[in-house]
Amino acid sequence: MSIRNIGIMAHIDAGKTTTTERIIYYTGKSHKMGDVDSGNTITDWMPQEQERGITISSAAITCHWKDCQINIIDTPGHVDFTAEVERSLRVLDGGIVIFSAVDGIQAQTETVWKQAEKYEIPRLAYVNKMDRIGADFFKVVGDIENKFKTIPLVLQIPIGNESNFEGVVDIILNKELHFSMENGIPKLTYSQIREEFIEKVILFKKKLIDILSQFSEEITQLFLEDKEIGLDIIKREIRRGTISRFIIPVLMGTSLKNIGIEPLIDSIVDYLPSPFEKSFSAFSLDTNKKILVDPNENKKLSALVFKVQYSSVIASHLYFVRVYSGEINPNKKIINASNGKREKFTKIFRVFSNKNEQIDFVKTGDIGAVLGLKFSVTGDTLVEENNNVLLEAVMFPEPVVLMSVEPERSSDEVRLKEIFEIISKEDPTFSYSESKETGQLIISGMGELHLEIILTRIKDEFNLNVYTGKPQVSYRESAGKIVKEVFEFNNIFAGKNIDFKIGMIIKPLSRGAGNKIDFECGIEPVIKSAILRGITSAFVSGIFGYPIIDINVSIFSIVCGANKISESAFESISGFAFHSIFQKSDPIRLEPIMLLEIRTPIEHTGEIISTLNVMGGVIHSVSNIGEYDLIKSEAAFEKLFGYASILRSSTKGRGSFTMEFSYFKEKLS
């Protein structure tokens, strides 16, 4: 049976979850259609999701259509949960990007599009909500072409528009498609194209052939010879163009009213790739080089842990894995190639949202979940012996907001830390630490909503009440200038007199460059590893108490005294040395700058812009969408706490906004 691993991506409220629920229902996996407003969707299973009507975690669903197994991951649309999108895209072979026919391309649409480009994921575009006032299919198609510099391939034209939208004309089949429900059973009927649509169908069929002929010699030849271009050839070439990311097939519908679902599922099977149609990149631990691995040829296990989820039912973590080659089964001896530790699967599951079906194995190209791993985290590679490869890990953005938390009862502090450990293991964008000055527990995340959801989980899922401080900005710090110095340590450490000198050069790097450590002197591998650990640990907190970013540390000399120095001593003293030298680099504090996209009624645009200017914001653009203006701007995150209330008041509740992290900038005051 063929497999499709697909993700459904979009801006919040574009209809991702509703579309996913319809696909699940139409493929027979569910016997009822979930509804977001009613809070009974299958993919949004967390209580917080059902309560808020948004997707927070990436739910995995397996269903079947026309002898094809489809693994669907419904991803969040809110920017606070970008990590869920990122780790989902890492393991997908194809995607559906959903656009609102009214709002078109929105802020998070651009974000997920860029993420999909990063992972080179072939996509379909689905223009949803065609029945809404202001729906404009062809404007959205034009925006996709102009904004994303891609070639949209229109496969359908609408029958009616807005409240009169009733179906589509399939350009490839030359048929009208009408959608209905009879006793809860979907019914798709075909009819001849009405006279009023024939001219437009001919025009778009010609456009379709013109686009395909840009990369298909076969279609070009048939066209030049004035021969009929068969349905099989057209579908095959659309598939080839989609997989190569030369084109983006575009479909439409209104998922809430069950219009357009069957053609969308057909297109998943017809145009998106199978896991066996693409080699995957890996790092060879034998040659220290990047390699391409063909899953058709390599039968040894290589799998990626892309998500860790705590189950309160079994009081254990469930590990979601994508198998790139070979097979997972309980008898297989495996190694975590990321840390060299041996692991074992005790149980294997097929996942259906928050329900699990135990199975015997997960084969090449498939997605499943396992129990029994002890030393693995998100992004780790699992292999069998003698398969020395490392898969590309999932990269996550830095947290930008922090908050102090303490339990109602001081006796619960240990338990609270244990809960934080559980959550941080499953959510790489959440972290916690203990303030050196106050002893308070500090949690960090991607935004106010992100932390709010976590605090709700602590109360509802773990039955623990906590007090919280106000949300604060999670700043960063970096070096203000180059500094070169030798740090001397001549003291007692762990009961031994130690004489140790280490010379470092600390240089500031450009924003976004990350931290780098290099050695200009010869050194034993064991000592080198200890020093690396010590300095890396020191990056966690600088002189202002914030993480240190964007610096280069060069070790140019190491001198040891007569007494033998332990690894732990090298590690600890290297951290002391770094902090001592870093203090002399005139450290600077950095604040997060956020990108904002504000949607406001036209009559309130002036007031919104004035408010942004007072906040020190920078306006990038103002564009019009019917009765609304779209304002794109940037502002310091510390100025944006409570902005939702300000906007709601200014626009009488009709305005909305999204924001996402852009970059760190030196804070001058």
Curated annotation (Swiss-Prot):
PROSITE patterns: G_TR_1, G_TR_2
GO BP term, example: ribosome disassembly
Residues engaged in binding GTP: 10-17, 74-78, 128-131
Highest taxon listed in the record's lineage: Bacteria
GO MF, one annotated term: GTP binding
Residues of the tr-type G domain: 1-276
A GO CC term attached to the entry: cytoplasm
Compartment list: Cytoplasm
Subcellular location, principal: cytoplasm
Keywords: Cytoplasm, Elongation factor, GTP-binding, Nucleotide-binding, Protein biosynthesis
Cited Gene3D superfamilies: 3.30.230.10, 3.30.70.240, Elongation Factor G (Translational Gtpase), domain 3, P-loop containing nucleotide triphosphate hydrolases, Translation factors
Function: Catalyzes the GTP-dependent ribosomal translocation step during translation elongation. During this step, the ribosome changes from the pre-translocational (PRE) to the post-translocational (POST) state as the newly formed A-site-bound peptidyl-tRNA and P-site-bound deacylated tRNA move to the P and E sites, respectively. Catalyzes the coordinated movement of the two tRNA molecules, the mRNA and conformational changes in the ribosome.
Recorded family membership: Belongs to the TRAFAC class translation factor GTPase superfamily. Classic translation factor GTPase family. EF-G/EF-2 subfamily.
Designated name of the protein: Elongation factor G 2
Phylogenetic classification of the source organism: Bacteria, Pseudomonadati, Spirochaetota, Spirochaetia, Spirochaetales
